[in-house]
Amino acid sequence: MSRIGNKVITLPAGVEIINKDNVVTVKGPKGQLTREFNKNIGITVEGTEVTVTRPNDSKEMKTIHGTTRANLNNMVVGVSEGFKKALEMRGVGYRAQLQGSKLVLSVGKSHQDEVEAPEGVTFEVPTPTTINVIGINKESVGQTAAYVRSLRSPEPYKGKGIRYVGEFVRRKEGKTGK
């Protein structure tokens, strides 16, 4: 069984946590994140260490305990280092470009798909077939990357589509003729 909730979170230099009635604000060099946590979970800040405690050992409290600790750690990492999801496009004529804060995708449709960057998330297009989704909130970076991928997810026959860098796409054999 996982014991993630019992691990202590160590704050890097330049990161500050303010806990007021389980509404936690984390400030760091990359920005600020605020999130409300369950009232039953105790969050204590002592110097550069943050501990998360639970009132009892019920199954519900154990799950909330681990999730709270993981979310809090993601906030600390986000404001100090940030998060990045890299996507790659494979297919003839598939390309991406930036227009202001919008991501414009040509993925084999009769029209171009436009994706507006949500608040706190930015797009980077180092090459026409590579997209980086960058931000301080892990949840919104992951959701935005998943949405971009869903516009043309990789198909199993030729492998065309948008995929995460390093993602394995299982290939199928096509029909055989008579």
Curated annotation (Swiss-Prot):
One cellular component term from this protein's GO annotations in UniProt: cytosolic large ribosomal subunit
Top-level division of the source organism's lineage: Bacteria
GO molecular-function term, one example from the UniProt record: rRNA binding
Swiss-Prot/TrEMBL GO biological process terms: cytoplasmic translation
Keywords of this entry: Ribonucleoprotein, Ribosomal protein, RNA-binding, rRNA-binding
Keyword Lyase (UniProt): no
One of the Pfam families matching this protein, by short name: Ribosomal_L6
Task performed by this protein: This protein binds to the 23S rRNA, and is important in its secondary structure. It is located near the subunit interface in the base of the L7/L12 stalk, and near the tRNA binding site of the peptidyltransferase center.
Subunit structure comment from the entry: Part of the 50S ribosomal subunit.
Family to which the UniProt record says this protein belongs: Belongs to the universal ribosomal protein uL6 family.
Protein name, per record: Large ribosomal subunit protein uL6
Taxonomic lineage from the root: Bacteria, Bacillati, Bacillota, Bacilli, Lactobacillales
